[in-house]
């Protein structure tokens, strides 16, 4: 039980540190221009390709551990990366580059009876947390959409 509490407090500390770093990054990213965000997405896609062998090696260890613990075949299929899935992660980021900039668009405008003008403008999300179970490619999709 004590070991379980240690793991829990370690996880809590790790998540707290990640949130702190994420908030600091958000304050910079939230002010970045579209070209900079596109460059970051391209750099991430390039790094995925550069590191694909290492990504597949670590994923193979995750898959082996999942199989050893008796996880279902469907779960293991979702967990498993191969060359095609890793390339799809990179091309997915590149597809996001071709989208229009979602930030700064006026979504609605109206005037209150007292004459106050109100505009709804798209803004960066800020820091988000994602909990998922078995699809490592979701990490890249979610991160790309957040950039």
Predicted regions and their residues:
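N-terminal Rossmann-like NAD(P)+-binding subdomain of aldehyde/semialdehyde dehydrogenases
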Residues: 1-117, 145
């Amino acid at each position: 039980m004590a070991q379980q509490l240690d793991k829990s407090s370690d996880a809590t500390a790790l998540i707290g540190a990640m949130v702190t770093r994420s908030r600091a990054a958000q304050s910079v990213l939230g002010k970045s221009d579209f070209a900079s965000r596109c460059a970051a997405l391209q750099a991430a896609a390039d790094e995925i390709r550069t590191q694909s062998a290492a990504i597949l090696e670590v994923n193979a260890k995750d898959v082996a551990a999942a199989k050893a613990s008796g996880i279902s075949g469907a779960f293991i299929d979702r967990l498993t990366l191969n060359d095609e899935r890793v390339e799809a992660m990179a091309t997915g980021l590149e597809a996001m580059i071709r989208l229009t900039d979602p930030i700064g668009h006026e979504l609605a405008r109206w005037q209150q009876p007292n004459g106050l003008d109100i505009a709804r403008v798209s803004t960066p999300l800020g820091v988000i947390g994602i909990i998922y179970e078995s699809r490592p490619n979701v990490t890249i999709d979610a991160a790309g959409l957040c950039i």
